[in-house]
């Protein structure tokens, strides 16, 4: 929703959201989640066996995994904060995600108050990597601002993501970082919104969304680029 004038930017968390399977024509085949609360942001492992998603079923926005048929649901994260936007590594053994993780008393109160209203403020987020079961959790960015929309390079050794850490506002550009948090490199240099990057499985193509060249409108389009390591 559009925030009121002078208010902070927020996202809605709809408690009616569930996860479904659809065929390629858009027909619903099966409902995978039925718990009360927000179940969304689902992505499928490249191995085709598991799904990772964000849920409020425990009272906070945590990551969970389940089998591709919806069975064997397991909680992955357990710390206060908005854990979401998760993707599997190419070999299906790790997860990359972004999280808000409030620490101060005032930040914790604000987070809880907003969540009680079905809202989150996605303006302070960092990237984390962990094993699929949640073990070996590591924070790989500490840049400030909103660092989000992470995606693994097909090598499994690098992460591409969107960030506004240089300005803390606008624009958002794409950055590359090693999975251990070293070697930060800027990829796009637009005065626009560049986000949601994804590699082709062979690593030769990059697709991302951007509102560049939109004639001054609020339109966001998809772009494809060659990727050269």
Label each PLM-derived region with a short phrase.
Residues 1-18, 31-39, 54-64, 68, ...:
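A flexible loop/linker signature enriched in serine peptidases of the S9 family
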Residues 23-27, 67-71, 131-135, 178-182, ...:
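Short loop/turn segments that connect beta-strands within beta-propeller blades
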Residues 46-47, 90-91, 154-155, 201-202:
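Residue-level detector of Asp-centered blade-edge/turn motifs that repeat once per structural unit
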Residues 51-52, 95, 159, 206:
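Hydrophobic beta-strand positions that form the internal "hydrophobic ladder"
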Residues 72, 93-94:
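Right-handed parallel beta-helix
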Residues 81-84, 92:
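Right-handed parallel beta-helix/beta-solenoid
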Residues 198-199, 206-212:
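CBM-like carbohydrate-recognition segments
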């Amino acid at each position: 929703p559009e925030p009121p004038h002078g208010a902070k930017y927020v996202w809605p968390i709809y408690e009616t959201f569930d996860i479904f399977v659809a065929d390629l024509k858009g027909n619903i085949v099966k409902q995978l989640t039925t718990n009360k609360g927000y179940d969304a942001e689902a992505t499928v492992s490249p191995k085709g066996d598991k799904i990772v998603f964000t849920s409020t079923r425990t009272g906070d926005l945590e990551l969970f995994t389940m089998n591709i048929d919806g069975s064997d649901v397991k909680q992955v994260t357990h710390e206060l904060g908005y854990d979401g936007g998760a993707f599997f590594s190419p070999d299906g053994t790790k997860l990359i995600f972004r999280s808000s993780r409030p620490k101060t008393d005032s930040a914790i109160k604000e987070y809880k108050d907003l969540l009680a209203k079905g809202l989150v403020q996605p303006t302070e987020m960092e990237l984390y990597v962990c094993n699929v079961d949640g073990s070996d959790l590591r924070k790989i960015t500490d840049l400030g601002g909103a660092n989000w929309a992470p995606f693994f390079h097909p090598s499994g050794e690098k992460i591409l993501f969107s960030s506004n850490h240089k300005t803390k506002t606008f624009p958002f550009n794409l950055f590359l970082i090693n999975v251990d948090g070293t070697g930060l490199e800027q990829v796009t240099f637009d005065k626009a919104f560049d986000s949601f990057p994804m590699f082709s499985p062979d690593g030769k193509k990059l697709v991302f969304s951007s509102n560049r060249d939109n004639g001054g409108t609020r339109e966001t389009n998809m772009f494809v680029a060659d990727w050269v390591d």
